[in-house]
From Swiss-Prot:
Transmembrane segments: none annotated. Keywords: Nucleotide-binding. The keyword Nucleotide-binding applies. InterPro entries: DUF520 (IPR007551), UPF0234-like_C (IPR035571), UPF0234_N (IPR035570), YajQ-like_sf (IPR036183). It comes from the Bacteria. Belongs to the YajQ family. One of its GO terms (cellular component) is cytosol. This is Nucleotide-binding protein PBPRA2024. Nucleotide-binding protein. NCBIfam families: PRK05412.1. One of its GO terms (molecular function) is nucleotide binding.
Amino acid sequence: MPSFDIVSEVDFVEVRNAVDNSARELKTRFDFKNVEASITFDKEIVKITTESDFQLTQLVSILRGNLAKREVDAQSMTQKDTVRTGKAWACNVEFKQGIESDTAKKVVKTIKDAKLKVQASIQGEKVRVTAKKRDDLQAAMALVRNNEELGQPFQFDNFRD
């Protein structure tokens, strides 16, 4: 029986490239001239520090733009609370890796509510979908890809015929 896995993974090489491009753009932007601002990447976390809250939001939008250019979905990005220490504003940005159990249950429920002729089962941090026909699998892929309520980007791999 044909099957595939639904996963949610981020390519951290592309994230590092986007952070490097953002740091390069930070050096050349006029609104960041004579400003202490930095963006660094370390172990799946991007740390952003600036002198003001406005500059922090600008730097996050620069990062989002560079992530989009590198084809990393911005939905996988989670911005943590902004912290002010002295005259510096700091923010950590984390990336969702894997499918959490609540989200996996929503994916399975969405597929079952659509009344497609497929079976979906949770296997750790991924969801396996099996069906008798490849067309049913493609319908399930389109359903998951177009569902905005899940709030997470998904990739499909491990296709079997």
